[in-house]
Amino acid sequence: MNIVPELKNRESPLVFNEKNVEKEKIEALIEAARWAPSCFNNQPWSYVFVRGGDSTRKDLEEALSPGNGWAKKAPILVAVGAKPDEDCDMNGLPYYAYDAGLSVMSMVVEAEHLGLRTHQMAGYDEKKVRKALGFHESQRIIVLIALGYEGDVKSVWDKLEQRIKDRLAQPRTRKSTEKNFFFASFGNQHG
């Protein structure tokens, strides 16, 4: 099945090239994220782009979980926050987080389109990120994203844990459609 190549070819690299990301590309990423859909058009997200030389970079890096230490080499780290109080009050569900995810996905697809790579991370200390970057206490930190041009994994191969090497050696896969997609009712495979 043919789909948009930016979706099919997206990967989350562990190694980034040191090359700086051009200002025009960052602006395009911001526009892509900005135009994402959101419940009642609330747009509850906030993005902070942190470059290697920024004064907040060291504190942000210290907020990463040990397993995400590789992200320190990325030219840009992006923190995405969202405000629960700007949520749609529908069915008790956290639409602010869903909306932020839509915005992130829009940015990720645009990054792929521009020849950039992203690696989204859940491994971080939310309080440390909030303090390092000045997010308001009312904001939740939804995700951190390493952003840049993909580097050569061979340059760090000897330093990788075996479980990571094993994962990288496998082709990228997805669950079969029969496990997640149904018609008319849950479990119904017949469309």
Language-model features and meaning:
Residues 1-191:
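Acidic, surface-exposed loops and disordered segments
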